[in-house]
Amino acid sequence: MKTQTRKQRKKHTRWPWIVMILIMILIIAAAAHSMMRQASNADSSAAQSSSVSQAHPAPAQESEPTATPVPTATPEPELATDRPITTEEAAEMDALLDSMPGSISVWIQDIGSGLTYTYKPDNGFYCASTLKAPYALWLCQRDEEGLLDLDAAVGSESGWDLIYPLIAHSSNGAAHDLGAMWPGSLDTGFSDFLTELGFASPEGCEVVEDGIHGWVTGADGGRAMRALYDYFETGTENALELQEAFLAADHDLLYCPAPAAKKYGSWDQALHDMAIVYAERPYIISMFTDWGDQEVSFPEEGRERMQQVGQLAAEIILND
C-alpha cells in the first residue's frame, strides 16, 4: 500500500510543472505574435506614408522675394556736368564789357554743353570781311553737292587756290574773283543759306564781284562759326581743307589759349573777330564792335580790349 501511494504522489507532482511549461509556451507564442503584428503594421504605415509623399510632394520652401536692383546712374558727359558760365561769371563779363566804349556785341558758346553767353547780341554792324567765313562754307558745301566745281579755273587759278588766301589772309582780291565766278547773293541762294544759319538780316548780305555787303551781329558771327565747327567735324576732304585755312589765320585780336580756327573783319567803325578755340574744352567766341578804322587793320586800343575779353572768356570756360 505504501509503495502504490508513493507512485501516485510522484504522478501528482509532475502535472503542475507541465502546466507551467505549457503556459510559458503560450505566453511566448502570444508575445511573438504580437511583435510580428506590430512590425507588420509599422511597415504598412511607412509604405503608406511613402506613397502619400510621392503622390503629394511637400511644397518647396519659398525663397525670399528678390529686391528690385537699383539702376546704376549713367555718368553725364564731362562737358555737360556743370554750367560753364555761372551767374557770377556772366556778371563779371558784363561788367568788363560795360566798361568799354562804343557799341559791342558778344556771343560765346561752350561747344560741349551748348550753353551760350550773350552780350547785346542784336547790336548790328557792317560785316567787313567776317562774311567771307560763311561764304567759304557755302562754296565748299555746294562743291560737295555738285552745284559748282572749286577745281575749275578762276582767272589764272582754281577756286581752291583762292579759298586759302580768302580765309587765312582775308584776301579781298580772292573775294573779288570768287564773287565774280560764284556770287553769293539773294538770287543765288546765299541769303537763304544765311537764313538757315540764323542770321538776323540775311537778305542784305552778299559777296559779289563789286564787294562785300551786309549788316550783321555778334550772334550772327557766333552761329557762322558753330556751323563751320559742325562742318569740320564731318571730316570730308573739303571740310578738312577749309579748316586748314581757318587755322592758318595769324591775326591777333581776341585772345585764344589754344589753336583756333578764326576770321576777323576790319573797316571803318567795324572791328570784329570770331574764333573756334580748340582748347581741352572747345568753345566759340564772337565779338563785334564799332572800334574799326579804315586806315588801320588792327587799332591797338581795340586789340587790347579784345585781348581782355578773350582772356576772361578763357578763364570762365576753362576754369583757369
Which residues does each PLM region occupy?
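A conserved catalytic-loop motif detector
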Residues: 213-268
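Structured C-terminal helix/loop/strand segments within mature extracytoplasmic catalytic/sensor domains
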Residues: 2-94, 100, 116, 124, ...
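A glycine-rich, coil/turn loop motif that links secondary-structure elements
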Residues: 121-126, 155-157, 207-216
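Conserved catalytic neighborhood of penicillin-recognizing serine enzymes
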Residues: 147-190, 199-200
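Mid-domain, small-residue-enriched loop/turn segments at the edges of structured enzyme/sensor domains
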Residues: 175-231
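Short, conserved catalytic-motif segment at the N-terminal edge
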Residues: 101-124, 147
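Active-site SXXK
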Residues: 114, 124-154, 166, 285
